């Protein structure tokens, strides 16, 4: 079981709702993933009209928890305003907070992120901040009141997997009581498994599933990858070594020489 603020879930895979070939495929992929939490962009819903209504109907049919996001926001003011609109529209105090600082890498503006998180938490929000793997930034977010922190593995949509494993491991070691979710940059189920093997509580992704040749099958693959990674972490992974260590004993009499 896993807790996000006061909500308990069983799935450690969170997925986005954008970029799918069709709404029907999106719905089937979410079901196949087993995800209980999906991210939704306010900008998509705010467009309104029949398209927005149809999308919202599909989401409601899935019986999942919606995590609105502030995707595309590039200032503290814009992110805070978007979060407040999302709370009104979706009826939730949850917000996946994004404050983008660079258009090419979509790297978070971590200074603005901490400022926006502080403002929103004081206003009663439960913030899921998208950040880099920087320990100081994560610590500042926790000090501001975030009980969930979501560092990236790599730039959004890059599919590179975990670039700075040591930094992510340090975050896990230093923030043992915080729910940590690897968010962005995962491209393969093995990447998700690796994040869970590090002790991360969950992963959030979108493009790797939505842009796969078969999004539904890929969603199922990520579900299995997450389950495998968590099981491996709980089982206790052996430590890596610099030198070989024989797995077969070489001391004693060979079995074919033993006297019965």
Curated annotation (Swiss-Prot):
Its EC number is 2.8.1.10. Keywords: Cytoplasm, Schiff base, Thiamine biosynthesis, Transferase. Belongs to the ThiG family. Coiled coil: none annotated. It comes from Bradyrhizobium sp. (strain ORS 278). One of its GO terms (cellular component) is cytoplasm. 1-deoxy-D-xylulose 5-phosphate binds at residues 157, 184-185, 206-207. Pfam families: ThiG (PF05690). InterPro entries: Aldolase_TIM, Thiazole_synthase_ThiG, ThiG. Homotetramer. Forms heterodimers with either ThiH or ThiS. It comes from the Bacteria. Pathway: Cofactor biosynthesis; thiamine diphosphate biosynthesis. CDD domains: ThiG (cd04728). The lineage of its organism: Bacteria, Pseudomonadati, Pseudomonadota, Alphaproteobacteria, Hyphomicrobiales. HAMAP family: ThiG (MF_00443). It catalyses: [ThiS sulfur-carrier protein]-C-terminal-Gly-aminoethanethioate + 2-iminoacetate + 1-deoxy-D-xylulose 5-phosphate = [ThiS sulfur-carrier protein]-C-terminal Gly-Gly + 2-[(2R,5Z)-2-carboxy-4-methylthiazol-5(2H)-ylidene]ethyl phosphate + 2 H2O + H(+). One of its GO terms (biological process) is thiamine diphosphate biosynthetic process. It is an enzyme of class 2 (transferase). It is found in: Cytoplasm. PANTHER family: THIAZOLE SYNTHASE. One of its GO terms (molecular function) is thiazole synthase activity. Catalyzes the rearrangement of 1-deoxy-D-xylulose 5-phosphate (DXP) to produce the thiazole phosphate moiety of thiamine. Sulfur is provided by the thiocarboxylate moiety of the carrier protein ThiS. In vitro, sulfur can be provided by H(2)S. This is Thiazole synthase. The active site is at residue 96.
């Amino acid at each position: 079981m896993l807790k996000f603020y006061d909500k308990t879930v069983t799935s450690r895979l969170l997925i986005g709702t954008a970029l799918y070939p069709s709404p029907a495929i999106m719905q089937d992929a979410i079901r196949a993933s087993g995800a209980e939490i999906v991210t939704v962009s306010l900008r998509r819903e705010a467009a309104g009209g029949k398209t927005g209504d149809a999308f919202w109907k599909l989401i409601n049919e899935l019986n999942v928890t919606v995590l609105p996001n502030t995707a595309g926001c590039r200032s503290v003011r814009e992110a805070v305003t978007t979060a407040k609109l999302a709370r009104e529209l979706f009826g939730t105090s949850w917000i996946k907070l994004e404050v983008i600082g660079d258009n090419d890498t979509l790297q978070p503006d971590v200074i603005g992120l901490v400022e926006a998180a502080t403002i929103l938490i004081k206003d009663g929000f439960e913030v899921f901040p998208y950040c880099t793997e920087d320990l100081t930034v994560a610590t500042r977010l926790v000090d501001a009141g975030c009980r969930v922190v979501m560092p990236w593995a790599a730039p959004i949509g890059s599919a590179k997997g975990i670039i700075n494993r040591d930094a992510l491991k340090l975050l896990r070691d230093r923030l043992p009581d915080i729910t940590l979710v690897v968010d962005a940059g995962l491209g393969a189920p093995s990447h998700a498994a690796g994040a869970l093997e590090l002790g991360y509580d969950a992963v959030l992704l979108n493009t790797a599933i939505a842009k796969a040749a078969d999004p539904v099958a890929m969603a199922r693959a990520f579900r299995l990858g997450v389950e495998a990674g968590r099981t491996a972490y709980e089982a206790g992974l052996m430590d890596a070594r610099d030198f070989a260590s024989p797995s077969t004993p070489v001391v004693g009499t060979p079995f074919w020489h033993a006297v019965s």
